[in-house]
């Protein structure tokens, strides 16, 4: 768990307030106690708090591409990063760290905004193309990692937690009555709404695109969907009998658990007392070939 935050001047000209970025980062220190990093460029300011899991010694963020024209800050993990890294290196990309997040800058170089279809993991990230003036805020398919944003005048602020938005000094902690009504009625909020006025969550499976203007005017943030659930049509029949489907599920599930055990630090399990967490931990122990410590 890391923390990301930042600001985007929609006019694309002003340098970010460094003290503001430091306040936003300080509000996220509990998410990333190991390190911090910042980026300041005309129109764009990034702040990152790091919890080291992969690439312990050289994974400071922001992470840049080879010529430092693309930069990224990320909270999350990419489970198939060794395979993606090998594919990108075969295409000529040069990596400078062992961090799994570095695949983002090279995937962007290779595929542009189609990079999302090549990601397998849980993540929230901010990427800037300094040459083209394009900023992308992306969130994983089902919204495991949080990402909130707010437009205040001609500036967009974003962060892993709303408290960091408020720490910027530009976002007021005013309650949204409808958001509170949803929270107290359903014990949850819709994918976009929050309990604060003017603050929204980036929806799962979406990314926010901001193209900074080259001349006058203001950029218009555009939210785009890159993924959705693919449900079968009514009446469709599954291929195979129950035993075949059970074997197929077990194979997919074991692979999903296996790739989530990759880390440069010890991996443990957290048991809630239910069947699902026990099943995950038992599968982890089986695929790892050893007991997995649990709490």
Language-model regions: role of each:
Residues 1-295:
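Cysteine-centered catalytic environments shared across enzyme families
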């Amino acid at each position: 768990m890391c923390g990301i935050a930042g600001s985007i001047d929609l006019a694309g000209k002003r340098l970010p307030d460094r003290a503001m970025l430091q306040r936003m980062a300080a509000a996220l220190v509990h998410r990333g106690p190991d390190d911090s990093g910042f980026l300041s460029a005309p129109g764009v300011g990034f702040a990152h708090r790091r919890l080291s899991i992969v690439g312990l010694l050289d994974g400071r963020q922001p992470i840049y591409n080879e010529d430092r024209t693309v930069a990224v800050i990320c909270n999350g993990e990419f489970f198939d990063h060794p395979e993606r890294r090998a594919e990108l290196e075969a295409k000529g990309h040069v990596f400078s760290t062992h961090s799994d997040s570095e695949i983002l800058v090279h995937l962007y170089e290779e595929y542009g905004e189609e990079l999302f279809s090549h990601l397998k993991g849980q993540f929230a990230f901010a990427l800037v193309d300094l040459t083209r003036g394009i900023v992308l805020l992306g969130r994983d398919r089902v919204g495991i990692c949080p990402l909130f944003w707010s437009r205040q005048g001609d500036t967009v602020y974003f962060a892993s937690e709303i408290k960091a938005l408020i720490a910027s000094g530009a976002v007021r902690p005013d309650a949204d009555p409808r958001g509170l009504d949803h929270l107290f009625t359903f014990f949850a909020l819709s994918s976009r709404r929050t309990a604060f006025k003017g603050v929204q969550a980036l929806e799962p499976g979406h990314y926010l695109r901001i193209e900074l203007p080259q001349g006058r005017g203001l950029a218009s943030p555009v939210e785009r969907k890159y993924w959705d659930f693919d449900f079968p049509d009514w009446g469709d029949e599954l291929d195979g009998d129950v035993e075949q489907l059970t074997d197929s599920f077990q194979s997919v599930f074991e692979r999903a658990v296996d790739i989530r055990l990759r880390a440069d630090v010890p991996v443990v399990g957290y048991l809630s007392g239910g069947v699902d967490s026990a099943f995950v931990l038992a599968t982890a122990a089986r695929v790892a070939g050893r007991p997995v410590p649990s709490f």
